[in-house]
């Protein structure tokens, strides 16, 4: 006996659009939570200073992550996706570097070595990793344009 259709027929492009939309939402959510966490923690790090305080750098990360989240959701262009990926990759890389390596003061950047894990830092790693994966998907899995026959 033939199986009954489970719903209306779908095109391959519908699935791709859904996955890209989900990736955009995940990227924006990860970047949005990253922005919130950095803004929330900034005051605690104002005392760690050189020329620039670590709190100021946290506020800068919060602003960049918020802008990246908006670009991924609203602008939806490769350049915006690239900016979002750079913010996510850069933020995650710096967090891990300063967690595991004591690089000291770098010019105006204070010594941000912090060899401990705590809830907000763990959450930041998770949301930044989600944003990295989602934005890399957006950059690498570009939709195909019409093919010449």
Task: Tell what function each PLM region has.
Residues 2-149:
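Membrane-interface extramembranous regions
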């Amino acid at each position: 006996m033939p199986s009954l259709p489970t719903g209306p027929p779908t095109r391959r492009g519908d699935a791709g659009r859904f996955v890209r939309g989900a990736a955009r939402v995940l990227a924006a959510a990860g970047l949005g939570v990253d922005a919130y966490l950095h803004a929330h923690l900034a005051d605690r790090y104002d005392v760690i200073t050189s020329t620039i305080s670590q709190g100021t750098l946290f506020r800068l990360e919060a602003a960049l992550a918020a802008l990246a989240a908006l670009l991924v959701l609203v602008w939806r262009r490769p350049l915006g996706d690239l900016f979002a990926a750079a913010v996510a990759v850069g933020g995650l890389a710096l967090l891990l570097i300063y967690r595991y390596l004591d690089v000291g003061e770098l010019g105006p950047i204070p010594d941000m070595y912090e060899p401990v894990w705590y809830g907000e830092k763990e959450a930041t790693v998770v949301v930044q990793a989600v944003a990295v994966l989602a934005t890399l998907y957006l950059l690498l899995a570009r939709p195909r344009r019409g093919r010449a026959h």
